[in-house]
C-alpha cells in the first residue's frame, strides 16, 4: 500500500454545468453542510469547512493545502456580489476571494493577509483597501464589470477602492473563497527528482 492520501468524494447528482440562478444564500438557514447543494466544498482534516450559526467557516492549519468553497453563478458581465466577512485573527493566515470564468481563470482577487490588510489585486500589483480587525464584521460589496475590466469594492457602505482586472475574461461564472494561495508548482517544466 502506498503512503499517499486516500480521497473519498460525495458528488450530488445530477451534475450541473450551468447555474440557473444567482446566489442568495443565508447560512443561518442551513443546519448541515450537506444542505449546501449549490456550493462546491473542498474541506480537509486540517483545513475544514463548517457551519457555525450564520457563518460559513473556513479554517486552516495545513501547511500544504487549503480550504475552499466555490459557488457557480450564471455567466455575468456586470456582477454585484455582497457578503459579510469576519476574520478571527489578523496576524496569520490568508483568505483569498476570487471571481472566475467558466474555465476557472480569475479576473480579480481580494485578500485578507497575515499583515492585517484587506487588499485587492489589480494588474500586477495589489492595492490596500483597509486594515482589518479581528472579530469585526465587515459588509463587503463588490461590483465587477467585464466590459470595463474593473472591480470596485465597498466596505460598510464606503468605497474602499477600485482596481483593474488582472486577467480579461468573457464572463464571470464563479465566486470562490480559499484559505491559501493557489498552487502553481510543480509545472510541466519542473525538473524530475
Describe each model-derived feature in a short phrase.
Residues 163-193:
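Flexible glycan-contacting loops in extracellular carbohydrate-active proteins
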Residues 119-141:
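Short, aromatic/His-centered strand-loop micro-motif at the edge of beta-sheets
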Residues 154-158:
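Short strand-turn-strand beta-turns centered on an Asx-Gly dipeptide
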Residues 50-121:
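Secretory/extracellular carbohydrate-interaction modules
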Residues 27, 81-83, 135-146, 151-153:
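Short tryptophan-centered beta-strand motifs in secreted/extracellular beta-sheet-rich domains
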Residues 3-12:
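Structural motif
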Residues 13-41:
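Extracellular carbohydrate-recognition regions
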